[in-house]
């Protein structure tokens, strides 16, 4: 039996679920399809810092999505908590950036994007062991706790009537007259009016397998990231710290997350002893107090990397009813709300708040 659908979203990570929320709020009927469990890939594995690493070194197209998303997060988090009863732990604890050789560029970016900054006070540095270089304190930068945000979002969407189909592999796709006509899976077949591809690191593989003759092939590659979690006490660290390309993130319950590696390992998600050792050494050197606490978790995820870090958001040029929201690399959470709204604007033919040209598929 084949089901007619309004909108089918392929991929149940943060991008897929936030896109579903935007489309649902506009009155559309949405179904999310995933080959595994909802929210179990890169979205679950990330650290949850709601700011890119050194955003002033990133393309403006990233900052545009970031700043718009930051405006949305407080209300979004409260709405999800109120409706689902699950706290996403949006938490504006602030972030210390230890090394800023390009301090003027950093300050210019903060001023132009209305992000508060201060010279880091000495009292903030005394318990840390690193070579500081014009340390910068960003007092308003927040975090979210990825697994709880995803669980809260799924519960909210379920309550709102969004359908989830999990552990369903796609076995066939029929293209007819510039449209993705039907999709067959191991569970059921569908004929969607619109299909949205939010498959993260698997997006390019999906397109190569099912749409090999189309005029574009997106460059989204899996980039493995490994993280550690220390079972620390709540008074160990009050704020996030970025030192070079690694960071510490204190959760509200006291646990401290250490990230992260950036590895070209294909679709291999296994953790490694070398990464565990490197992350442990970084964390205990920077914050010696961590030596007294055990590691309680070590995991890996696959980020959807693009050449510039800019995601692909928009319609496929060859198929009138296929759109894509993927390729956010390390910034899926922090760019997620604005990315979802941008794609919803395009699908619903609303005037976008953000110029879509930089994210178009080409």
PLM features: what roles do these ranges have?
Residues 5-31:
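N-terminal Rossmann-like FAD-binding beta1-loop-alpha1 element of flavoenzymes
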Residues 8-10, 190-202, 340:
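Short hydrophobic core segments
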Residues 18-26, 48-50, 87-91, 194-320:
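Active-site substrate-recognition segment that forms the wall
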Residues 49-126, 132-133, 282-284:
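Dinucleotide-binding Rossmann-like beta1-alpha1 core, especially the glycine-rich loop
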Residues 64-67, 100-103, 136-155, 270-275, ...:
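Short beta-strand to alpha-helix junction loop
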Residues 137-186, 190-194, 204-205:
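Helical element adjacent to the flavin cofactor pocket in flavoenzyme catalytic cores
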């Amino acid at each position: 039996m084949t089901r007619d659908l309004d909108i089918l979203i392929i991929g149940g990570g943060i991008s897929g679920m936030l896109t579903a929320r935007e489309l649902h709020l506009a009155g559309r009927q949405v179904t999310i399809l995933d080959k595994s469990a909802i929210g179990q890939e890169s979205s679950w594995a990330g650290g949850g810092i709601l700011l890119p690493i050194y955003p002033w070194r990133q393309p403006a197209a990233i900052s545009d999505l970031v700043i718009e998303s930051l405006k949305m997060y407080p209300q979004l988090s409260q709405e999800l908590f109120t409706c689902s009863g699950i706290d996403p732990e949006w938490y504006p604890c602030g972030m210390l950036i230890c090394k800023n050789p390009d301090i003027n560029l950093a300050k210019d970016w903060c001023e132009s994007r209305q992000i508060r900054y201060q010279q880091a006070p000495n009292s903030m540095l005394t318990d840390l062991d690193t070579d500081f270089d014009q340390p910068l304190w960003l007092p308003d930068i927040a975090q979210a706790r990825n697994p709880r945000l995803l669980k809260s979002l799924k519960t909210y969407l379920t309550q709102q009537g969004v359908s989830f189909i999990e552990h369903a592999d796609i076995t066939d796709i029929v293209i007819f007259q510039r449209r993705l006509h039907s999709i067959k899976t191991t569970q059921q077949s569908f004929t969607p009016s619109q299909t949205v591809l939010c498959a993260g690191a698997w997006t390019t593989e999906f397109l190569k397998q099912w749409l090999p003759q189309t005029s574009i092939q997106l460059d989204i590659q899996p980039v493995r990231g490994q993280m550690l979690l220390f079972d620390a006490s709540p008074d160990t660290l009050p704020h996030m710290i970025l030192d070079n390309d690694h960071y510490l993130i204190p959760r509200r319950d006291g646990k401290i997350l250490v990230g992260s590696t950036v590895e070209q390992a294909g679709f291999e998600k296994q953790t490694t002893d070398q990464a565990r050792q490197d992350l442990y050494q970084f964390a205990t050197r920077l914050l010696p107090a961590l030596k007294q606490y055990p590691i309680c978790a070590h995991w890996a995820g696959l980020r959807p990397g693009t050449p510039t870090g800019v995601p692909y958001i928009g319609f496929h040029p060859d198929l009138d009813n296929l759109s894509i929201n993927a390729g956010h690399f390390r910034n899926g959470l922090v760019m997620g709300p604005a990315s979802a709204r941008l794609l919803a604007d395009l699908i619903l033919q609303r005037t976008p708040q953000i110029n879509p040209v930089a994210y178009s598929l080409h």
